[in-house]
Amino acid sequence: MTDVPPRHPPRDSGDAWVEGPDGRRFWGRYGAAGLLVHDPASGILLQHRAEWSHFGGTWGLPGGARHEGESAMAGAIREAGEEAGVPADALEIAFTSVLELGFWSYETVVTRALRPFQPSIGDTESLELRWVPLDEVDALPLHPGFGASWPQLRGRLGESHRIVVDAANVVGSRPDGWWKDRAGAAARLLRQVEALSAAGVDASEFGLSMGRTWPQFSVVLEGQARKGAPDGASTPREQSDGASSPGEQSDGASRSSVQNGVEPSMAALTPEVTVVRAEGSGDDAIVAEVARSTRIAPGDQATTIVVTADRELSDRVAAFGAEVRGPRWLLDLLDAVIRP
């Protein structure tokens, strides 16, 4: 969580102090962002701040001032790469948390480590970089900003959100001529879900506080719609009934690369969209997908939402603890992402 100017002249117009109406100063003309990397086996990656820096000697997150026009996610990834050698391709985004003061903001970008890596000091802002077990974080002298946010951040590290989409039900809820080309309609829905997966979902949709979260999406296709697939280079991960469970990546699975306001390099950090092509009943495939999700991520912090208006299916998935939202809920989220 770097909020101090470098010792050399500013490299970007964002490298400047902002002063609030109460006289407090914060680093970053366009706001600032920090990266929290969580590895269940190692803990979280922390930066021991150089003594000459603001709140020097404390521990916080790699990060710093955002550049003009730069998203918080891009800024956090860039700063963590520069300061700590964090490889972007080793990360998957989980959620963001925002401190908004009106005249300045700080966004914490929380990610999961997909593979082990060793950080490396890249500039003079760090005395040390260390993986710290969760239970040992509070024993360190923490940067005041990070210390204030850590209890809430820690409480969310174990959360898991999955959205299972009844594609036939969602497509059929919008009279746009889908019946003329079921496969084409399914392909359009998949592209839209990929865009939403890349952009993330407002945390309030899951009853959480400010920020965004990146759920795992599974889209279940049946009948003629099973032929549907997005055009272009981007292809969601696919599985048929009985294939590997969501979260178990198969060889050759590719990550989504979606525009719609999301930088291509940032889209690579988002969870993959899983396409389930039902061999038989689509409802049975959805129930099986929900059951797999429950086994993969059990517990109070695991949320599974099934998008359907089918009452019988709703009752079946509710037996596994899944929530049910109607197609309109998902369509509103999709429209918000793809609208110019």
Task: Describe the residue ranges of each PLM region.
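Acidic, metal-coordinating catalytic segment for phosphate/diphosphate chemistry
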Residues: 2-36
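Short, basic and Ser/Thr-rich N-terminal targeting/leader segments
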Residues: 29-32, 105, 213-215
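Anionic group-transfer/hydrolysis microenvironments
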Residues: 36, 50, 135, 168, ...
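Entry beta-strands of beta-propeller and related beta-repeat scaffolds
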Residues: 43-44
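A conserved beta-turn-beta hairpin within the catalytic core of GNAT-like acetyltransferases
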Residues: 53-57
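Short histidine-centered catalytic/ligand-binding loop motif
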Residues: 60-69, 177-179
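Unchanged
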Residues: 65-158
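Nuclease catalytic cores that cleave nucleic-acid phosphodiester bonds
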Residues: 159-165, 169-241, 246-340
